[in-house]
């Protein structure tokens, strides 16, 4: 990229001086930033008719950046994630320009005001009631192993707890002797929350707790509520 225009000059300074020496950015990250600018330069040449040797900071505007971003999704069929990554690079460059090209502060701030695109195509996946029922019917509730699996599935569905939170449960985490039936969950940052349990889940847990396998292993209420397949 030639350095005979103010745009090329500042791009070179940004990539070769600011990012590696002031921000201590890795070489791989710098390469990804460079690729984003290469795409922008190619867009300006192909769609705006401005060759790289003629491209100036005055052409680096909010309107042109928006056209570039739309070009990525509409014509290049890039994902929303890729579009937002390119926007993040451009915003970072614009932030830096606020300090080295102060005279165009408003121009850079307009670019920085461009919002990231929400991925409207991303849908939340969830189980239907029929799916949950089918899932809970899979373990063989007549065996200790099946009772364990059923208790795990039912608890995770009922409480929405994370896998690690499930692994951290101890025998005394559950209160099944009197109402209200509850379970104490320790989450991130050792934050504790008390979650109520429906009677249907309580019945499943009671059967599991009474199983021969669990009684033999859980002599202490501080022992794990669920052992792994190796009995640990």
Question: Model features per residue range: what roles?
Answer:
Residues 1-232:
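Conserved catalytic core of the tyrosine transesterase superfamily
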């Amino acid at each position: 990229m030639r350095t005979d225009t103010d745009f090329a000059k500042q791009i070179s300074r940004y990539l070769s001086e600011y990012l590696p020496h002031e921000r201590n950015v890795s070489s791989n990250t710098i390469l990804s930033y460079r690729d984003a600018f290469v795409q922008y330069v190619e867009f300006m040449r192909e769609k705006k008719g401005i060759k790289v040797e003629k491209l100036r900071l005055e052409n680096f505007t909010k309107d042109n950046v928006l056209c570039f971003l739309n070009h990525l999704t509409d014509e290049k069929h890039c994902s929303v994630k890729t579009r937002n990554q390119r926007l993040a690079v451009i915003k970072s460059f614009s932030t830096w320009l606020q300090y080295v090209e102060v005279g165009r502060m408003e121009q850079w701030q307009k670019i920085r005001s461009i919002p990231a695109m929400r991925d409207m195509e991303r849908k939340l996946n969830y189980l239907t009631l029929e799916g949950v029922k089918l899932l809970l019917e899979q373990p063989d509730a007549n065996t200790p192993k099946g009772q364990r699996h059923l208790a795990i599935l039912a608890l995770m569905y009922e409480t929405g707890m994370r896998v690690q939170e499930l692994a951290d449960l101890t025998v005394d985490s559950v209160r099944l002797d009197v109402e209200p039936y509850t379970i104490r969950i320790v989450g991130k940052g050792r934050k504790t929350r008390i979650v109520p349990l429906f009677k249907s889940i309580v019945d499943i847990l009671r059967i599991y707790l009474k199983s021969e396998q669990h009684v033999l292993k859980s002599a202490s209420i501080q022992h794990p509520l669920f052992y792994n397949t190796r009995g640990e």
